[in-house]
Structures are given as C-alpha cells and as structure tokens.
Curated annotation (Swiss-Prot):
PROSITE patterns: NODB. Its EC number is 3.5.1.n3. Pfam families: Polysacc_deac_1. InterPro entries: ArnD, Glyco_hydro/deAcase_b/a-brl, NODB_dom, Polysacc_deacetylase_ArnD. It comes from the Bacteria. This is Probable 4-deoxy-4-formamido-L-arabinose-phosphoundecaprenol deformylase ArnD. GO terms for cellular component: membrane. PANTHER family: 4-DEOXY-4-FORMAMIDO-L-ARABINOSE-PHOSPHOUNDECAPRENOL DEFORMYLASE ARND-RELATED (PTHR10587:SF137), GLYCOSYL TRANSFERASE-RELATED (PTHR10587).
Length: 296
C-alpha cells in the first residue's frame, strides 16, 4: 500500500465557488480526506497576464491551453475591475470543507504573494500572513494549524515569518520528504511537508499528453522513494478536468495507492534542512526547494 498526501490549492473565486463543491463530492464518494488550502482575500489572478512577456510563462499558458483550462473569468480577474474578495463570499463552502478535511491558509492575495513576496520585508510578510489566517479562522470558527505558500514562493524569510504563528506544519516548498527547516537561530523550525510530484500544468504539453497523464503520474507515485505528496487545483481538477481526477482516484485504488491529509505524513523525528530558492521544469520563476542539511 502506497500512501500519498493529497493537497488541494484553491487560488481563485471561481475555484472556491465551483471547484471546491465538486471536489468535496468526489472525495466523499471515494472516502478520501485531503488538505485544502484556501486563498481568502481579493482574487487578482488576472494580473499575472503581464508575465506573458516572459517566454517560459507564455509557453506554459499555450501548452496547457490556459483559456480552456481556467476560463477567462479567472485569467482576467482583478484587471479591468477590482478583484472580488473570496473568503467571506464563499464562507459556507469553506466551512463545509472544514467539516471533513484539513483546512489551511494558501494566501490572503494569491497574486500579491506570488508576484511580490520575494521582495517584501519581514513585517509586511507577517502582516499578510496574519490577515489571511485571521480571515480563515473567522470563517471556520477554529484555529488554523497549517499553511501552504502560494506558488511555492518560499525561502528563509518566509520560514522565519511563519514561525511566530506556531502552526503544526507548512507546505511551502518542493522536495522529497517532510523535514524541519533550520531557523536563523540554529534551532529547528515548524515542520515542512514538501510537494514531491509535478502538477498537471507543469507537464501537460511538455512531457505528457492529457490522456496519458494519470498513468504517467501513478508510475511516478509508485517509484517515489521519498514521501509522495501530490497537489491538485480547484480550478483544474475541480472544474475542466474533474473527470480526469475521478479516473485517477479509481486507477490509484486499483494500484493500492491511498490518499490522505498531509498531517498524516508527520511522524517521529524529522531530518533537518533548509528552504532555498530554486527552479523546476515546467514552472516559470523561482520557488522554494528543500535542501537537506549539510548538502549543497
């Protein structure tokens, strides 16, 4: 039996309003629990359109057929009109998710974090995280115990900024296994549970055809020598490609693969490491990557 952490990122208003309810229904039918990370502030995702001037981002949008994948309402959100606030407008949906699944913070403003957090000072970052946590806690009526940085934009500054919130774990980076990042003080910080597997948009049209993706991913899962963690998006697997996700769950069950919330992957002593800026194939720009202590 292979155990895989299932992380669901919710980036947008539409993903929350339409994608999450569909995913909740699918997961309920398959008796699966997951970790769901919500963006709760303004939906300004359309402001990423300026990145089309960057060849790597333009190629990603073209090969993933972004207009069909996400819809124009997502691609233009927050451009010609102010971005709608996501959290309180979809409070009932978020509360329903929290009844059955582990719920954490993705971001206050997903676009702002992904585009600008790498240049923020520590206090700006702390204030942004606090605003998101406070909003999500108001919605579900209980403390938030986990978070996942938008776009995996995380480095030592993010690790230090989140430490003061005393969360159970964060999932801010890409890597191979859970670990404890070293703080500037030399002490181990809050556990990190990295995502180990590629997302749909990172490989479709580059390494894999859409119809071959599930078989390709299951092969990666079964060969994973670390602690496999897979991320889906409410805007993708909860909308245009929900049938592909259902097929993945059915095929995974046949292969003895089970999915679980990320917290179930925490156990015993964790190795030490760091979160450093790096790059991965299929994703434009830098992102947080696990570095085992003592390695370079």
């Amino acid at each position: 039996m292979t155990k895989v952490g299932l992380r669901i990122d919710v980036d947008t208003f539409r993903g929350t309003r339409e994608g999450v309810p569909r995913l909740l229904e699918i997961l309920s039918k398959h008796n699966i629990q997951a970790s769901i990370f919500f963006s709760v502030g303004p939906d300004n995702m359309g402001r990423h359109l300026w990145r089309l001037v960057k060849p790597q981002f333009l190629w990603k949008m073209l090969r993933s057929n972004a207009a069909s994948l996400y819809g124009w309402d997502i691609l233009l959100a927050g451009t010609a009109w102010p971005g709608k606030e996501i959290g309180h407008a979809n409070a009932d949906i978020i509360r329903e998710a929290a009844k059955y699944h582990e719920v954490g913070l993705h971001a206050w403003d997903h676009h702002a974090w992904q585009a600008h957090s790498g240049n923020w000072d520590r206090q700006t970052m702390v204030d942004d995280i606090a605003r998101g946590l406070r909003t999500l806690e108001e919605i579900i009526g209980q403390p938030i115990t986990c978070s996942a940085a938008a776009g995996w934009r995380a480095d030592q500054q993010v690790i230090e900024a989140k430490e003061g919130f005393h969360l159970r774990y964060n999932s801010d980076c890409r890597g191979v296994m859970p670990f404890r990042p070293l703080l500037d003080s030399g002490k181990p910080g809050t556990a990190q549970i990295p995502v180990t597997l590629p997302t749909w948009d990172e490989v479709i049209g580059r390494d894999v055809k859409a119809e071959d993706f599930n078989g390709w991913l299951l092969n990666r899962i079964l060969r994973d020598k670390g602690t496999p963690v897979y991320t889906i998006h409410a805007e993708v697997e909860g909308c245009a490609y929900q049938h592909n996700f259902v097929d993945l769950l059915k095929r995974a069950a046949q292969e003895g693969v089970t999915f679980c919330p990320l917290s179930e992957l925490l156990s015993g002593m964790l190795p030490l490491g760091q979160v450093v800026r790096g790059n991965i194939a299929g994703r434009e720009g830098w992102l947080g990557c696990q570095q085992i202590a003592g390695s370079r």
